[in-house]
Amino acid sequence: MVLSQRQRDELNRAIADYLRSNGYEEAYSTFKKEAELDVNDELDKKFAGLLEKKWTSVIRLQKKVMELESKLNEAKEEITLGGPVGQKRDPKEWIPRPPEKYALSGHRSPVTRVIFHPVFSLMVSASEDATIKVWDYEAGDFERTLKGHTDSVQDISFDQTGKLLASCSADMTIKLWDFQGFECIRTMHGHDHNVSSVAIMPNGDHIVSASRDKTMKMWEVATGYCVKTFTGHREWVRMVRPNQDGTLLASCSNDQTVRVWVVATKECKAELREHEHVVECISWAPESAHPTISEATGSENKKSGKPGPFLLSGSRDKTIKMWDISTGMCLMTLVGHDNWVRGVLFHPGGRFVVSCADDKTLRIWDYKNKRCMKTLSAHEHFVTSLDFHKASPYVVTGSVDQTVKVWECR
């Protein structure tokens, strides 16, 4: 790039000013002679400190250019993935976008679990402050607090109608709440330690729980009686989740394994052992994900014609793994989180996986290509839980920063 005569003259004067003001007298007088500079005081004032100013502004501009380039690349990616250009995107591909729609405060300790109500525009959060709070996620309003547990509430689960809510706690109990009257209708005792996970079975007749006492138990909703105990994990069972038809249970544990159980017989059908640390969370793949999973893994439909079932697991080893339960094989490992993975789910459309972790982020994975396609800085502290609404374009997250955040998807 060639400078004009005027630009060259200005640059020379700026260099001369720099040399003189920094005490390089010999270099200054040599340079002045060689550049044939006629220096007077009026001009000097104009060029005082000019070289430094130009230098710092160039660095600032470079930084800005790099920021803009990365934003441009992100925008290009969104366009190739069918990003939010106009409103042509299929809702099956909507993903959460920053910033959050609401940041809801009210809990006095870390939030441990967040879930959407299956029918109304409500969500529920559980916390180490021993309370459960109900919020309207569309309006961002606090509705009410459910009190009854005497220690940290670890997990919550709705039945499919949304009329019953189950909760479990470090106080070693499981509670069943009438979500229409917001009253506790039953308390179940039987675990010998912190109850870390609870889920109402799809048929609504039974509740399943997992505990630090290394067992899982099944309870009758009508009576509150424990009807089954599942044993096999060697350490704290972190989470338990039934599959869509309630015939299988998946569990994960501090013993670094994921296990799948047949509900009817209590037998352990699979033990999945590739994680290298505590497995924190699990999630079953919905039917909507089966085509993409088969495409991604090249697993042709088996002789029965029905693929799967498939399961996701997230671990303190910072990875997410996808499993084919029929073979016990790990189909893929998603690497990208910088800390413990605390929550993992399939996008309701089936094409993406969404996760949250102690690296304070929410991540969306294009698992067909095994890559993280979006990272959202979600909270100021560890993100402990997330839920994706099955029908409305919302994601909710909970954190050790004591807030619950609602994210809109588009």
UniProtKB/Swiss-Prot annotation:
Organism domain of life: Eukaryota
Which UniProt keywords are given for this protein, alphabetically ordered? Answer: Cell cycle, Cell division, Coiled coil, Cytoplasm, Cytoskeleton, Developmental protein, Differentiation, Microtubule, Mitosis, Neurogenesis, Repeat, Transport, WD repeat
Q: Name one GO molecular function term.
A: protein heterodimerization activity
GO annotation, biological process:
apical protein localization; brain morphogenesis; cell division; establishment of mitotic spindle orientation; germ cell development; microtubule organizing center organization; microtubule sliding; nuclear migration
Expressed, tissue-wise, as follows: Enriched in the photoreceptor cell layer.
Q: Which PROSITE patterns match?
A: LISH, WD_REPEATS_1, WD_REPEATS_2, WD_REPEATS_REGION
User: Start-end of the WD repeats?
Assistant: 106-147, 148-187, 190-229, 232-271, 274-333, 336-377, 379-410
Q: Fetch the Gene3D superfamilies from UniProt.
A: 1.20.960.30, YVTN repeat-like/Quinoprotein amine dehydrogenase
Which intervals of the chain form a coiled coil? Answer: 56-82
Primary localisation category = cytoplasm
GO CC terms of this entry: 1-alkyl-2-acetylglycerophosphocholine esterase complex; axon cytoplasm; centrosome; cytoplasm; cytoplasmic microtubule; kinetochore; microtubule associated complex; neuron projection
Localization (cell): Cytoplasm, Cytoskeleton; Cytoplasm, Cytoskeleton, Microtubule organizing center, Centrosome
Name the InterPro entries on file: Dynein_regulator_LIS1, G-protein_beta_WD-40_rep, LIS1_N, LisH, PAC1-like_LisH-like_dom, WD40/YVTN_repeat-like_dom_sf, WD40_repeat_CS, WD40_repeat_dom_sf
| Positions of the LisH domain | 7-39
Give the matching Pfam families: LisH_PAC1, WD40
Q: Which HAMAP family match?
A: lis1
Question: What family is it from?
Answer: Belongs to the WD repeat LIS1/nudF family.
PANTHER family cross-referenced by the UniProt entry: WD REPEAT-CONTAINING PROTEIN POP1 (PTHR44129)
**How does the entry describe the domains?**
Dimerization mediated by the LisH domain may be required to activate dynein.
Task performed by this protein: Regulatory subunit (beta subunit) of the cytosolic type I platelet-activating factor (PAF) acetylhydrolase (PAF-AH (I)), an enzyme that catalyzes the hydrolyze of the acetyl group at the sn-2 position of PAF and its analogs and participates in the PAF inactivation. Regulates the PAF-AH (I) activity in a catalytic dimer composition-dependent manner. Positively regulates the activity of the minus-end directed microtubule motor protein dynein. May enhance dynein-mediated microtubule sliding by targeting dynein to the microtubule plus end.
Q: How does it assemble?
A: Can self-associate. Component of the cytosolic PAF-AH (I) heterotetrameric enzyme, which is composed of PAFAH1B1 (beta), PAFAH1B2 (alpha2) and PAFAH1B3 (alpha1) subunits. The catalytic activity of the enzyme resides in the alpha1 (PAFAH1B3) and alpha2 (PAFAH1B2) subunits, whereas the beta subunit (PAFAH1B1) has regulatory activity. Trimer formation is not essential for the catalytic activity. Interacts with dynein, dynactin, nde1 and ndel1.
Q: What is this protein called?
A: Lissencephaly-1 homolog B
Name of the gene encoding the protein in the UniProt record: pafah1b1b
